[in-house]
Each structure stands twice: as structure tokens, then as C-alpha cells.
Amino acid sequence: LSMGKGTIQDAVTDRSGITGEKMELDGYNVVEGAYTTTYNHMGKNQLCTIVAFNKESEEVAHNVAMQIAAMNPIAIDEAGVPESVKEQEIQVAIEKTKAEQVQKAVEAALKKGGINPTHVDSEDHMESNMAKGWITAEDVAKAKDIIATVSAEKAANLPEQMIQNIAQGRLSKFLKEVCLLNQED
């Protein structure tokens, strides 16, 4: 594909020579319209957009291109999101949901046992709160036992369908946030 006085390959090679870094072009697209504009946020070549319009309006085009860059989409719509991204997001959502469900069960069990969960949410807090006299060594031992027991029991008995439903909801929210056509004003 020609570009200026050479090809795109020539431009990539020239740029590699300037920066001293190996560069590769893994793909390209042609953007066509009656008027095409670009936006390069702060001139840093990190957050850029190219937008084509059906008629020329420099101010509107600049504002739209800038807004698209600010929205930072990864695709136009859900169909454009790579399956690998969706799979990674669903796995993150599943793990996060499981951790939250276990944490909720632990906090409920601690409260039921008469222990404030915020006093025993980490080893540092346990030591600090014992030094302040807010909890006793017996409370810490009881809390550690509750945390270990409830965590293991809850993790082993999480309802899979509930986890999947919550994870799917999180994936839907993610897609709404990263797909240009799904983002809200």
C-alpha cells in the first residue's frame, strides 16, 4: 500500500531507524469519508482516533474525534471485541465474584461470633487492634478459626449458577463500558 513517497512498510522501517526500536505493523484499515480527521491526545501518540464523516465540519469532527478518544473504546460494538478479551474478563469476573461471596460469608460469621470484621481483616490490623485493646488474643484466635473454616466451607459450596450469572452481568457491564456504540453520555 502506497503512502506519500513510499509504502507503509517504508514508513515503518524509517520510523524504526529514528527510534532505534524494532517496530512491526500487525494490520491496518482504510478509513474513507467525505471528511476524515484525526485526534492525537496531547501529541503523545498513545491515545489517538481517526474518524470519517459524510460531510466536512472541522469543529464538529475534532470534537467527535476527541470524545471518542476520551471514551477509550476497545471496539465499536460487542462483535468487535476479541473472544480472548471476553474470556479473560469472564474469568476475572468469576474469581472476583467468588472472592466477594466468600468475604461476605466470613464477615457475617465474624459478626455472628461477636467480632468486628474490620478489626481482624489483616494480620497487621489484628496486632494493631490488640495493642490498642480493641480485641483480645482470644478474639484473634477465634477470628482466625472462623476465617479459615468459613472460607473453606463457602469456597467449596458456592452455587455455580449464581457465580456464572453475576459474572455474566459483570461482563455485560464491561462490554457496555468499552464498546463505543454501547457507551452512555
What are these regions (language model features)?
Residues L1-D185:
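N-terminal assembly/interaction segments in proteins that build large macromolecular machines
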